[in-house]
């Protein structure tokens, strides 16, 4: 509730003693201190008072003095807006059992501004509690030192677990990969095109592939590019493999013919004697 709304009642009702407070509920159970407004203590307004105080700014004659009201409003008007809601909240929580039959509290009077200092002193405590809840690991106040120690003790196991977690993948990799020594390597066994030390893998042809290549070599010892592509697709081989096979087959054919010619020459020379 704004301070403008609270102080507006002071101007409308200057003579507070002429207005009597209403007492609701059972007269036997109700508290007697709510009936007389002139004998009430100023510190009870924020905690147990359910009526409205209309005795502020009165002189001895019972008339309202405008200068006193203006001075009291200017000095304490900054603390009114901040403490109105907290005072109303404390009033409802503290008087639940004693004044259950009483009506809802009215707006705070003008004189409660001077008695709002106990409430304003509790506001920093609420702020400290709020800071400790939002940032439990911060050192904003002395009451959070134990919380800081707890946070430090909780964070240290997490930091200790990080190196252990980071070291586990290396151990797993070491266990899954067996150690290979140089003498265990077999250079001549490789399925890649370019093996270690630049040695190419040996291609193993099936019986069907060898038979088809021999038929093609019987008709044509040299292949064109178009025919090489057709054979490669038919036998599921690469053009390079087809070319190398034909090169090796021609070398073998030349070697065989050379041996035949040498045998024929040696045999004919031995028979013929001039």
Swiss-Prot record:
Keyword NAD tagged: no
Any GO MF annotation of the entry: RNA polymerase II cis-regulatory region sequence-specific DNA binding
Region Disordered: start-end pairs: 68-177
Low complexity biased stretches: 92-101
InterPro entries in the record: Antp_homeobox (IPR050296), HD (IPR001356), HD_metazoa (IPR020479), Homeobox_antennapedia (IPR017995), Homeobox_Antennapedia_CS (IPR001827), Homeobox_CS (IPR017970), Homeodomain-like_sf (IPR009057)
Keyword annotations of the record: Developmental protein, DNA-binding, Homeobox, Nucleus, Transcription, Transcription regulation
Family, similarity comment: Belongs to the Antp homeobox family.
Name of protein: Homeobox protein Hox-A5a
Record organism: Takifugu rubripes
């Amino acid at each position: 509730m704004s301070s403008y709304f609270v102080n507006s009642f002071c101007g409308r009702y200057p003579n507070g003693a002429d207005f009597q407070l209403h007492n609701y509920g059972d007269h036997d159970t109700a508290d007697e201190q709510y009936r007389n407004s002139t004998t009430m203590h100023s510190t009870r307004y924020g905690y147990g008072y359910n009526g409205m105080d209309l005795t502020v700014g009165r002189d001895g004659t019972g008339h309202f003095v405008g200068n006193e009201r203006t001075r009291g409003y200017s000095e304490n008007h900054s603390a009114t807006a901040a403490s109105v809601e907290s005072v109303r909240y404390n009033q409802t929580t503290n008087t639940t059992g004693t004044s259950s039959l009483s009506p809802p509290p009215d707006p705070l009077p003008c004189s409660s501004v001077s008695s709002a200092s106990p409430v304003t002193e509790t506001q920093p405590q609420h702020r400290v509690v709020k800071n400790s809840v939002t940032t439990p690991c911060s050192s904003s106040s002395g009451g959070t030192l134990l919380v800081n120690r707890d946070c430090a003790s909780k964070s240290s196991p997490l930091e200790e677990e990080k190196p252990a977690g980071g070291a586990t993948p290396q151990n797993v990799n070491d266990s899954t990969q067996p150690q290979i020594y140089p003498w265990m390597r077999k250079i001549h066994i490789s399925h890649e095109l370019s093996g270690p030390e630049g040695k190419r893998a040996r291609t193993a042809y099936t019986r069907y592939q060898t038979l088809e290549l021999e038929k093609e070599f019987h008709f044509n010892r040299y292949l064109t590019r178009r025919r090489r592509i057709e054979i490669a697709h038919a036998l599921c081989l690469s053009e390079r493999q087809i070319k190398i096979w034909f090169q090796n087959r021609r070398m073998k054919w030349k070697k065989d013919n050379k041996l035949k010619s040498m045998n024929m020459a040696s045999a004919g020379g031995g028979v013929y004697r001039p």
